[in-house]
């Protein structure tokens, strides 16, 4: 094979091999829900950051959000949440997942999630998420069925009555290719 043909082949093949895709988290709303017989509370954060790197047909995603970025509308309650979840010691919530590249074209996916929160790592299998594609971006919505015991957090109490252990986390994220 001549040097010119080899060079031409390299110029055509190498970019195709390096055509890995990356995704960046553009917008996010993550909200947890706490239920108590006397009231309901939602804490909301828009501070999540994330990146997805695709290679060999698989995409690895990492999302991170500061624990202190969740706002329930009551600064005293938010401070107590930071104490209960050991937010000073473990200031970030991280989530990892791996999805096939082809998942981006589906209307629904079931994702296996690994979430690290309050110093504990928990895995959730086959969590359903809805995908909507618009203008090259993908919006992902769903609910993570988290509980306080999953992360070894003792349920806080109000008037000696503990909150329910379920803390579903509503996810609404928009991803764009980088």
Q: Where on the chain are the PLM-derived regions?
A:
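Bacterial N-terminal signal peptides that target proteins for export
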Residues: 1-6
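Hydrophobic h-region of N-terminal signal peptides that target proteins for export
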Residues: 10-18
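Low-complexity, acidic/polar, glycine-enriched regions of mature
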Residues: 19-178
């Amino acid at each position: 094979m001549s040097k010119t043909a080899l060079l031409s082949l390299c110029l055509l093949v190498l970019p195709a091999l390096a055509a890995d895709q990356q995704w960046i988290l553009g917008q996010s709303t993550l909200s947890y829900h706490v239920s108590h017989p006397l009231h309901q509370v939602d804490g909301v954060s828009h501070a999540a950051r994330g990146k997805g790197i695709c290679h060999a047909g698989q995409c690895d995603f990492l999302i991170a959000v500061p624990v202190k970025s969740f706002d329930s509308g009551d600064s005293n309650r938010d401070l107590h949440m930071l104490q209960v979840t050991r937010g000073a010691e473990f200031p970030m919530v991280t989530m990892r997942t791996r999805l096939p590249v082809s998942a981006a074209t589906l209307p629904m996916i079931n994702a296996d999630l690994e979430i690290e929160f309050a110093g504990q790592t928990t895995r959730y299998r086959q969590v359903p998420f809805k995908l909507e594609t618009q203008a090259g971006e993908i919006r992902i919505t769903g609910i993570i069925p988290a509980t306080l015991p999953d992360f070894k957090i003792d349920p806080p109490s109000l008037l000696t009555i503990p909150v329910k252990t379920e803390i579903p986390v509503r996810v609404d994220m928009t991803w764009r290719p980088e």
